[in-house]
């Protein structure tokens, strides 16, 4: 369970992705329950239906619930009428049984987080296993008889041609009525409290919806600057702080397709959509002619569940999820064919196809060895870096650590984190020895890091510190202002930049020069006020993200500037607006 809201998750460590997997798992098992002819397959698949549905409910994923309904309707449309009827009946039965045991399982699970009791733990499993076993018995022994009965009664009915649309259309109407029912406070109060809380506030003003809309708008702004081939792998994580509309923190735009467009541009997105269209069109065309279609339908269900949910989440960012999805797509695009008798070639000469196979196998083997070499080199560099950081100043002397970092950079000269670690250690050496050679070396690696990844968030702090350590306050201020244009929501950088500008302005003031640096400090203060106004203009339901406000440090500096300029009214105004009065009690 996640802390606070008790949303169940898995080693994936994300409830929404777990919900997507449970959606796929439910549809696969429930589909096999009503379609497979093998009793053993039906035995195992039916036993897993209720655990999958219960797990989905316990994720409390609103997007997951919505995708579940959409996929359920789509699956109904592609099934024949008799299977639709069976699927509907067995799904309703699974839903009723799951909702029946849900309150007990939920209460036991929540209580176990604070007061683990082995008896309650066993009771929870017993309830789940009994419900699953009952559902399995119904599926294994009653569904085949129900199937034969329906075949006998409905085979000769005249409405058979259009009957397959009756249940899906009726289900759509039921979904609409259910959605309307969720707007009724009296009806929704009949649900258990956790479900009531999650379903009761489904609307476009809900914070997760508003935040996603903000992510998508900012994502499209990135695409505008990198329209064709995109900004490269990991682009969102590197760029979003430069484009964000408010100081939120997220490593993903919460949409697989948007993230793909950001990284690979419109060319990459079009190729992805074309590939998906090819697979799905080929799969649909094989429906009649492919004898293995019913088995491939399972992979269609799984891939569609994840891909549809990925419209509003980042499930595909997990390597094992995306790998399995593309495996499903590969199976969907294939088809079962009859075995072709092998033609034996006579004579001493090997067929040309065999030579091609050998050449292909050899080239792929060489490529695999090369990739394995570079991968092993990268893994070794990472382990060496991690070990050095952990043992620094404990078992490894600082000078030895620096030499190790140089070795790591020889292996991976353009890795941002390795460069940043080396810069940090060089600056620490300067603090100890006051030898500016270390700062020059640090600046060399800073320049390299800016060339390799100019958007890396760790650069500004170390570059500014390098100038400050050299006592180049003017250079530090100029660099700070440059980076503030790139990262307009970095509160710490605003404070440090305004502090530097105040120092430079004071030097100009004492030398009877025009303190233009104070003007720049006031401009940054006005920029901060505009940023604060943007946050205040956000809907009440939307979370603003990181704290961004006019701090006491900034307020005192700006008030000090106005004081030296003789503008006492603004001095008092700034302090009254942003500095809390002292508690004299």
Where are these regions (language model features)?
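N-terminal intrinsically disordered, acidic low-complexity segments at the extreme N-terminus
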Residues: 314-343
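Hydrophobic alpha-helical transmembrane segments in integral membrane proteins
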Residues: 177-194, 352-396
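TM-adjacent membrane-interface loops and short helices in multi-pass inner/ER membrane proteins
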Residues: 14, 204-206, 210-250, 257-260, ...
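Amphipathic alpha-helical repeat elements characteristic of tetratricopeptide repeat
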Residues: 24, 47-48, 193, 213, ...
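Flexible interhelical linker loops that connect adjacent transmembrane helices
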Residues: 117, 148-158, 335-359
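C-terminal luminal/periplasmic domains and tails of membrane-associated envelope-modifying transferases
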Residues: 386-585
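Alpha-helical transmembrane segments of multi-pass inner-membrane proteins
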Residues: 1-6, 10-183, 262-291, 295-298, ...
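Aromatic-rich transmembrane-lumenal/periplasmic boundary elements in polytopic membrane proteins
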Residues: 1, 175-225
């Amino acid at each position: 369970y996640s802390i606070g809201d008790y949303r169940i998750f898995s080693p994936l460590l994300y409830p929404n992705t777990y919900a997507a997997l449970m959606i796929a798992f439910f549809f696969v098992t429930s589909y096999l329950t009503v379609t497979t002819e093998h009793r053993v397959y039906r035995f195992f698949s039916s036993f897993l239906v209720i655990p999958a549905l219960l797990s989905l409910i316990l994720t409390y994923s609103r997007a997951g619930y919505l995708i579940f309904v959409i996929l359920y309707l789509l699956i109904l449309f592609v099934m024949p009428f008799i299977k639709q009827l069976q699927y509907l009946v067995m799904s309703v039965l699974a839903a009723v049984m799951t909702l029946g045991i849900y309150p007990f399982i939920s209460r036991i699970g929540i209580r176990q987080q604070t007061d683990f009791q082995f008896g309650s733990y066993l009771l929870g499993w017993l309830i789940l296993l009994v419900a699953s076993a009952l559902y399995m018995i119904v599926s294994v022994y009653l569904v085949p008889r129900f199937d034969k009965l329906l075949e006998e009664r409905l085979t000769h009915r005249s409405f058979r041609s259009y009957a397959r649309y009756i249940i899906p259309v009726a289900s759509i109407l039921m979904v609409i009525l259910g959605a309307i029912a969720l707007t009724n406070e009296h009806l929704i109060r009949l649900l258990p409290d956790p479900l009531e809380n999650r379903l009761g506030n489904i609307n476009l003003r809900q914070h997760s919806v508003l935040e996603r809309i903000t992510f998508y708008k900012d994502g499209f702004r990135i695409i505008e600057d990198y329209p064709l081939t995109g900004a490269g792998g990991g682009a969102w994580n590197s760029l979003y702080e430069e484009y964000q509309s408010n100081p939120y923190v997220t490593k993903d735009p919460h949409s697989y397709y948007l993230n793909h467009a950001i990284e690979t541009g419109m060319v990459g997105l079009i190729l992805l959509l074309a590939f998906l269209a090819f697979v799905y069109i080929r799969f649909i065309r094989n429906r009649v002619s492919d004898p293995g279609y019913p088995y491939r339908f399972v992979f269609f269900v799984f891939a569609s569940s994840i891909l549809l949910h990925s419209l509003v989440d980042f499930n595909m960012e997990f390597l094992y999820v995306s790998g399995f999805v593309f495996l499903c797509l590969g199976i969907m695009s294939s088809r079962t064919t009859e075995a072709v008798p092998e033609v034996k070639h006579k004579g001493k000469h090997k067929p040309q196809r065999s030579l091609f196979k050998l050449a292909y196998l050899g080239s792929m083997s060489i490529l695999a060895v090369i990739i394995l070499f570079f991968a092993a080199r990268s893994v070794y560099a990472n382990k060496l870096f991690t070990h050095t950081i952990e043992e620094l100043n404990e078992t490894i002397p600082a000078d030895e650590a620096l030499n190790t970092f140089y070795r790591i950079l020889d292996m991976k000269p353009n890795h941002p984190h390795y460069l940043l670690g080396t810069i940090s250690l060089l600056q620490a050496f300067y603090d100890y020895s006051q030898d500016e050679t270390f700062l020059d070396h640090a600046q060399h690696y800073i320049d390299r890091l800016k060339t390799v990844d100019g958007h890396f968030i760790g650069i500004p702090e170390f570059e500014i510190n390098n100038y400050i350590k050299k006592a180049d306050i003017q250079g530090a201020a100029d660099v700070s202002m440059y980076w503030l244009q790139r990262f307009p929501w970095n509160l710490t950088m605003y404070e440090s930049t305004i502090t530097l500008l105040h120092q430079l302005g004071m030097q100009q003031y004492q030398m009877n020069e025009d303190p233009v640096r104070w003007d720049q400090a006031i401009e940054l203060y006005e920029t901060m006020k505009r940023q604060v106004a943007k946050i205040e203009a956000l809907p009440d339901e939307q979370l603003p993200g990181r704290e961004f406000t006019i701090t006491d440090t900034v307020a005192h500096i700006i008030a000090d500037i106005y004081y030296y300029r003789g503008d006492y009214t603004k001095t008092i105004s700034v302090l009254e607006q942003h500095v809390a009065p002292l508690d004299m009690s």
